[in-house]
A protein has these predicted regions:
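Beta-strand-turn-beta hairpins that frame and shape the catalytic cleft
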Residues: 21-32, 167-176
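Short polar catalytic/cofactor-binding loops
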Residues: 36-42
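Active-site catalytic loop in hydrolytic enzyme cores
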Residues: 14, 106, 122-176
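Short, flexible loop segments at the rims of nucleotide/cofactor-binding pockets, characterized by
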Residues: 43-46, 92-96, 152-157, 176
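Cys-nucleophile CN-hydrolase/nitrilase-fold catalytic domain and related Cys-dependent amidase chemistry
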Residues: 45-137, 142
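Acidic, histidine-bearing metal-coordination/catalytic regions of metal-dependent phosphoesterases
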Residues: 1-28
Length: 176
C-alpha cells in the first residue's frame, strides 16, 4: 500500500534534441528553364497563353524548378493599340497585367513549377511601372519592380523605376 504517498520524478535528458518544424528539403541542384520568346502577332491573350503553356509544359517535363520568361513578352498585344501613341499604347497594355499574373499562377500550380514572368507594365497610383511576378508552385506570388529603367522607357513610355531590390524565398532557394 502507498499510504497516500506519491513521488514525482523528472529526468532532464541533456542529449535530447526537440524535433524541428522545418520539413523543407534543401536542394543541392536547381534546374532553370529559360524561354527564348519569338515575337509574333497575337490576336488575343488566349493566343499568348497557348504559347506560354507550350513552354511551361516543355520545361516542366524536364523537371525544372523554375521557368523564366523574357521582358515584355506580352508586347505583341500592343498591336491592338496601334492607333494610339506610344505612351497610351503601353498604358493600354497594362490592362492585361493582372489577368496574366493570375494565369501564370494557375500554370505554376498545374505544372508544379515556379514561374518568373517576364516584365509587364503596371499602372499604380503614383505612375507606370515595369513589373514582373514570381509565381510559386504552391499558388503564392510576389511582385518585383524593375529598378533601372532605360532612358528610352522613361522618354517614350514615362515609366517609373522601382525603389528597392528584393529577394524572395522559394521551395528551392532564396532568389532575387
Amino acid at each position: 500500500e502507498s499510504k497516500h504517498y506519491a513521488t514525482l520524478l523528472q529526468w532532464d535528458n541533456i542529449y535530447y534534441t526537440p524535433p524541428t518544424q522545418d520539413f523543407k528539403v534543401t536542394k543541392t541542384n536547381v534546374r532553370i528553364g529559360l524561354v527564348q520568346w519569338q515575337m509574333r502577332p497575337y490576336k488575343s491573350i488566349d493566343d499568348v497563353f497557348e504559347q506560354v503553356e507550350f513552354f511551361v509544359d516543355a520545361v516542366s517535363d524536364y523537371k525544372s524548378d523554375f521557368v523564366l520568361f523574357p521582358e515584355y513578352f506580352n508586347a505583341p498585344l500592343m498591336a491592338k493599340f496601334n492607333h494610339l501613341g506610344e505612351s497610351e499604347a503601353i498604358r493600354s497594355l497594362a490592362q492585361y497585367t493582372n489577368e496574366i499574373r493570375d494565369r501564370f499562377i494557375n500554370l505554376a500550380i498545374s505544372y508544379n513549377i515556379n514561374i518568373i514572368t517576364g516584365s509587364m507594365p503596371l499602372i499604380k497610383e503614383d505612375g507606370l511601372y515595369n513589373v514582373g511576378f514570381l509565381c510559386r508552385r504552391d499558388g503564392s506570388y510576389d511582385m518585383y519592380e524593375k529598378v533601372h529603367i532605360t532612358p528610352d522607357e522613361i522618354k517614350s513610355w514615362g515609366l517609373t523605376g522601382g525603389s528597392m531590390v528584393k529577394t524572395f524565398e522559394t521551395d528551392c532557394a532564396r532568389i532575387g
